[in-house]
Amino acid sequence: MSMQASKLAKIEGLLFVTGDDGISPTEMAELVEISEDEVIQLLEVLSEQMAKEERGIRLARLANRYRLTTKVEHADMYKKLASSPIHGGLSRAALETLAIVAYKQPITRAEIDEVRGVKSEKALQSLVSKLLIEECGRASGTGRAILYGTTPYFLDHFGLESLADLPDLKELDLNEEEQDETDLFFEKLNADL
């Protein structure tokens, strides 16, 4: 095995092991014991190899972290998988809850319930099982309630580099036309999931 092939194999292994979290070129350079520039060159070689060959994965970059992802041309097959109960779409309650968590994280269930005006336990369970939110700590004070926040998968699923890419929230009363647009947004969002 050539020296370059050995380094490529190490980088590919690191990409696999880090999964959805991905890994930065700086971290790869430190672990493989090469320069960051060489890592970038090797990532380009690996990306080209994956594009040329009949492989089910590709190299993706998000927020200066690299990871292995599935190829877009296999999306129909993955949609079939997503239609299973574990990977199914989200209810309106779950979408509302997800939006609240995304914008107000870290946040407790009681705080979510207060914003929504109804209980959110089932919606939270659904979002946790779909890996869109996770426990991110405990609130201080009596009871030490669980705090929820979004996951890296949430960012990836919605094509965001970071939470700063979320649209700005504007406190306004929606007229009927705007409400219809909001409903269409939630319908599209649910269809995408």
UniProtKB/Swiss-Prot annotation:
Main location, first listed in the record = cytoplasm
UniProt-listed InterPro entries = ScpB_csome_segregation (IPR005234), WH-like_DNA-bd_sf (IPR036388), WH_DNA-bd_sf (IPR036390)
Q: What compartments host this protein? A: Cytoplasm
Entries under Pfam families matching the protein: SMC_ScpB
Q: Which top-rank group of organisms is this from?
A: Bacteria
- Return the GO cellular component terms, semicolon-separated: cytoplasm
Instruction: Indicate the secretion signal residues.
Output: none
List the Gene3D superfamilies hit by this protein, alphabetically.
Winged helix-like DNA-binding domain superfamily/Winged helix DNA-binding domain
Sorted alphabetically, the keyword list is: Cell cycle, Cell division, Chromosome partition, Cytoplasm
Q: Could you tell me which SUPFAM superfamilies the record lists for this protein?
A: Winged helix' DNA-binding domain (SSF46785)
TM region positions = none
GO biological process per UniProt: cell division; chromosome separation; DNA replication
What the record says about family reads: Belongs to the ScpB family.
Oligomeric and partner information: Homodimer. Homodimerization may be required to stabilize the binding of ScpA to the Smc head domains. Component of a cohesin-like complex composed of ScpA, ScpB and the Smc homodimer, in which ScpA and ScpB bind to the head domain of Smc. The presence of the three proteins is required for the association of the complex with DNA.
Q: What does this protein do?
A: Participates in chromosomal partition during cell division. May act via the formation of a condensin-like complex containing Smc and ScpA that pull DNA away from mid-cell into both cell halves.
State the protein's name: Segregation and condensation protein B
Q: What is the organism of origin for this protein?
A: Shouchella clausii (strain KSM-K16)
